[in-house]
Amino acid sequence: MHLGDLKHPNELHGLSLAELEDVARQIRERHLDVVSTSGGHLGPGLGVVELTIALYQTLDLDRDKVCWDVGHQAYPHKLLTGRFNSFDSLRQQRGVAGYLKRSESRFDHFGAGHASTSISAALGMALGRDNRGENFKCVAVIGDGALTGGMALEAINHAGHLPNTPLLVVLNDNDMSISPPVGALSSVLNRARLSPPMQFLSGSVEESVRHLPFMGGELPAELNRLKGSMRRLAVPKVGAVFEELGFTYMGPIDGHDIGEMTRTFQAAHRDGGPVLVHVVTKKGKGYPYAEADQVGYHAQSAFDLSTGKAIPSSKPKPPSYSKVFGQTLIKLCEQNSRVVGITAAMATGTGLDLLQKAVPNQYVDVGIAEQHAVTLAAGMACEGLRPVVAIYSTFLQRAYDQLIHDVGIQNLPVMFVLDRAGIVGADGPTHQGQYDISYLRAVPNFTVMAPKDEAELQQMMVTCLQHDGPTALRIPRGSGEGVLLMEEGWEALPIGRGELLREGNDLVIVAYGSMVAPAMETAALLEASGLSASVINARFLRPLDQALIHPLARRVPRVVTMEEGTLSGGFGAAVLESLNDHDINVPVLRIGIPDQLVDHATPQQSKEALGLTPNQMSLKIQQRFGLGSDDAAKSSPFQAVQA
């Protein structure tokens, strides 16, 4: 069978083992070919090829539901569910999404992008099924990393107390956490766990004893302990943990043996309650470079398949904001032993991997546990440390209560660096950093800022560490502006003070963070049209520099705000509220992300779609205020405004 001809995943049913192994080969080849060309997640999907095939051998995907945790390991799922021929468009504008989307396919049963959600979703589906009296299978596939997330453990705790609710959790243990493969012993233990005698000892014996007339329907404590002991003899220690939580545990099994997994999944489906099947896989399986460097090949830009090396950019780029942050933090940690960097399993993405190597005793990785990371930092701050929490903007959403309750209300000096703030590109709606401006505005006691370039980032880091209260700064994904950087000796910025970059008489542009450089380009375009614009680098969202903004707004009564974030409750809203509260009644044009999701595309394509390029913003400003061309003036709602 050629996968390009596969019309439905149920067509896998009945294929021989040799045919299924050929399907696995085709999936790997297609996966590698596409990701090496356009980039994407590599290692996770390569590791679950056989797992996906074996699982789908035992399911009817017209009825049964599968929730893939995070979703970056679901490329094989996509290749088996009607997207093999369109897979070349992976993570491209209007192409196949890099994560799961219910709107993309009826086989994407639950959308994902963040970790640790799958068990909760699958359990919810199972309860919905039972409520309607229906009969279909509900499955969650979760990695060992995502299982460290509190939400996953909460769901396991709940499901374990529902012994009559069938639910299958597949633990994809890719040898990065929990427990390594244990070879022949694990195979023996698994065969014993599935054998009829062990099923009798661990299950049927209880039912038999309960019906003895002198037992009164209850199992004596002594027999309960004996039953528990027999279970623990039959499974590894990690299995005993899940058994104690109310799950039937099966495994560990070889995650690249289709036959063994198929038999195990079939046995799991026959159970009438929650079951956890522990599958040991090799991340990057089938591509030696990815197997050897499982962290580096988790996700990749375009690369040469024959060498595994990234295809170099056509021209050199300045260092990324993440790298500048990481290198600067090393210096600050070396100068002050009380500074500690904290990450929630994203060291490489945030630049903290540099700190881990250079100053390991001032580095903490809490795993996928954003809530814990924030409150851990709060506790450290109580004891005189200066914690720096480096986290993606989209992931800090997961710890909003802790921001308010544990840091903000107590006014603790915790510094947050929000990486990937703004438009991130190909990862799509679940990863866009478009909400942090809005949600941080409301948190008590916080000082919130964003640099116009990487040099100002260094100054803001010093500002945060010297400030006796909670702080947050946002940095965009990708390269900096290429400005000259200082190795040390950075000076703190005055809190709440912006910067006037250029003066003009026709309008004032107030730009925040990554929009400062585009604002300057926009002002230059306006000047070419005969219009002069003042440009303010706001620097601070909270507190806003009213002393700079208000006089200019009174003198030049046309205000434009620019931000790379959602307009709802955003930076522009803060400026508008400030002007209104001080009776400065001038027209304000807010430019940013409207009330919509930003789908996967390149960052430039997304900005063009949102009207955030300098050319688009220049035209929008002229049209809004009736400045510049006659056509723009005729379409303006503010023709009567006097400069």
Curated annotation (Swiss-Prot):
Residues reported in the UniProt entry to bind Mg(2+): D144, N174
SMART domains: Transket_pyr (SM00861)
Cofactor, how bound (note): Binds 1 Mg(2+) ion per subunit.
Protein's UniProt keywords contain Membrane: no
A GO CC term attached to the entry: cytosol
MF GO annotations: 1-deoxy-D-xylulose-5-phosphate synthase activity; magnesium ion binding; thiamine pyrophosphate binding
InterPro entries cross-referenced by the UniProt entry: Dxylulose-5-P_synthase, THDP-binding, Transketo_C/PFOR_II, Transketolase-like_Pyr-bd, Transketolase_BS, Transketolase_C, Transketolase_CS
Enzyme Commission number, as recorded: 2.2.1.7
Subunit structure: Homodimer.
Biological function: Catalyzes the acyloin condensation reaction between C atoms 2 and 3 of pyruvate and glyceraldehyde 3-phosphate to yield 1-deoxy-D-xylulose-5-phosphate (DXP).
Protein name per the record: 1-deoxy-D-xylulose-5-phosphate synthase
Organism of this sequence: Synechococcus sp. (strain CC9902)
